[in-house]
Amino acid sequence: MVERDRGVLVVTLLASMLAFGQVATGQDWPQWRGPSRDGAVTAFDVPASWPAGLTEQWKVEVGSGYASPILIGDRIYQFARQGEDEVMLALDAGSGETLWRTAYNASFDMWAATRMHGPGPKSTPAYADGRLFTLGISGIVTAFDAETGLQIWQRPAGPVEP
């Protein structure tokens, strides 16, 4: 699958599921694999009958990368790459409208081991206390205000000790 299409596919699928009837009624999905990091949805109302298929409600180009979207209330947050920038997006879950977009330059040198997977980002944002946290492809940790998209701070992640 083309890397560009992966981000569009993920957001399109999430939008289709939301339009069908709230995948997790009243349950936010604030980080990778959900609230408990186990991939389990606990607040799901099983429909009396399943539709024959999903109907696309909206579609938006978010960029490339491997970050999963997160859902907080009626907002979808997506971390992606657009050109030489890493971008944090807030989308309206009902319409797909971009509520805000914050970008910063994140040029990336492709090594042989990373060339197949592209320049990222590869980590899903995390949400806590009104803030979004991202880890960019070049090891930069950034905090954003979830309401406005304002970049609060940005720092190198530091060395990883095995």
Predicted regions and their residues:
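Bacterial N-terminal signal peptides that target proteins for export
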Residues: M1-T12
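Bacterial N-terminal signal peptides
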Residues: V10-G21
